[in-house]
Amino acid sequence: MALTRLLIKDFRNIENADLALAPGFNFLVGPNGSGKTSVLEAIYTLGHGRAFRSLQAGRVIRHDQDAFVLHGRIATAEREISVGLTKNRAGDSKVRIDGSDGHKVAELAQMLPMQLITPEGFTLLNGGPKYRRAYIDWGCFHNEPGFFHAWSNLRRLLKQRNAALRQVSRYQQIRAWDQELAPLAEQISQWRAAYSEAIAADISATCAQFLPEFQLSFSFQRGWDKESHYAELLERNFERDRALTYTASGPHKADFRIRAEGTPVEDLLSRGQLKLLMCALRLAQGEFLTRQNGQRCLYLIDDFASELDETRRHLLAARLKATQAQVFVSAIAAEHVFDMTDEKGKMFHVEQGKIAVQPED
C-alpha cells in the first residue's frame, strides 16, 4: 500500500499542489517555515481527519478560504483507490472513497495506517498516559475489527456517566450506565492487554538494536486494580466519584509504562536516546502490523536530523529502508538525508508553500 498521488488545496500555506509520489522514500527539503511540515500534515490529515499540529480546522485552512481539500490515490495489490477529504471552518468533514460520499474518517484511517515521528513526539515517552494509551489503541484499532465501535461507545458512556455524577444522589440512579459501561471496559482492557503482550517481543528486539546499552521493560496497566471486576469497582467507588464529579478509575486511565533499568525512561535517557526509543516504538508497531495483516504503514518523519547524530541517522535510515514501506521525510538541507536516498526515491524542494521536484544531479 502506498500513496501514488497527493493533491493539496488551501491547506496551511499551500494553495495548490499536485504531487506524484515515489513508493519508497519521499524527501521534503527547504528552509524553516517553507511548508515541509504542512505536506506531512496534509498526508496525516487525509488519514486521520485532523491535523497533528492543531485540532481546530480553521487553523489549517489557508487564509481567506472556506475549506481545505485533500485528495489521494492509494495503490493496493489489486488496484488503485481514490480517497478525498474536505473540511470547512466549522469543522464539517466530507469523506469520499472511489467517488462516493458518506464515508467515515475511520475508513480512511483503516486504509492509510501511519506512524508519525516529530520533534514534539517525545510526549509518547514523557507526556501523560493518554499518549501511550493512544499508541496501544492504534494497534488495537488496526488489529481488532470491533475495537473502534467499542471505544467510541466507551467514550460516550463515560461522558454521560460523568455528567450524571453531578446530578444524582444514589447509586441506583446511575446503575443503568454502569451495566452498559462495565462490559465495554472489560473488553477494551482485554484487547489492550493482548496487544501489549503480542507486540512486546517486537518492541524489545527493535529497542535492543537502537539502544543496546539499556535494559528496557514494558508493562500495560489497565487503569484499575487487577483483583476487581469493573462493575463492582464502579459501585464501590460511587461516593468518591460523585464527590469528584468524574469516574476516577477505568480504561480511560490505562497506561503503557516504559522503563530503563527500572527507572522511567524520561528520567534516564538523553534527548537523542529518547528520540531513538520513540522511533523504535513506531517502527516496531508498523512492522508488527505488516506481519499481522500484510498492510504496510506510511512513515511520516518531520525534521529528520533533529536530536540525532550521524551514527543514529544512519541506523534509523537503514531500518526504515528495511521496512520497504513508503516514507516521507522533511529536512532543512539535502545533506541531512543523503544517506537515505536511492534511485527509487524522490526529492521535493519546498519554499513558501510551493513544491517542486528537485532534479537529480
Curated annotation (Swiss-Prot):
One of its GO terms (biological process) is SOS response. It is found in: Cytoplasm. ATP binds at residues 30-37. GO terms for molecular function: ATP binding; single-stranded DNA binding. Keywords: ATP-binding, Cytoplasm, DNA damage, DNA repair, DNA replication, DNA-binding, Nucleotide-binding, SOS response. Gene3D superfamilies: P-loop containing nucleotide triphosphate hydrolases (3.40.50.300), RecF/RecN/SMC, N-terminal domain (1.20.1050.90). Transmembrane segments: none annotated. GO terms for cellular component: cytoplasm. The keyword DNA-binding applies. InterPro entries: DNA-binding_RecF, DNA-binding_RecF_CS, P-loop_NTPase, RecF/RecN/SMC_N, RecF_2. PROSITE patterns: RECF_1, RECF_2. PANTHER family: DNA REPLICATION AND REPAIR PROTEIN RECF. Belongs to the RecF family. The RecF protein is involved in DNA metabolism; it is required for DNA replication and normal SOS inducibility. RecF binds preferentially to single-stranded, linear DNA. It also seems to bind ATP. This is DNA replication and repair protein RecF. It comes from Erwinia tasmaniensis (strain DSM 17950 / CFBP 7177 / CIP 109463 / NCPPB 4357 / Et1/99).
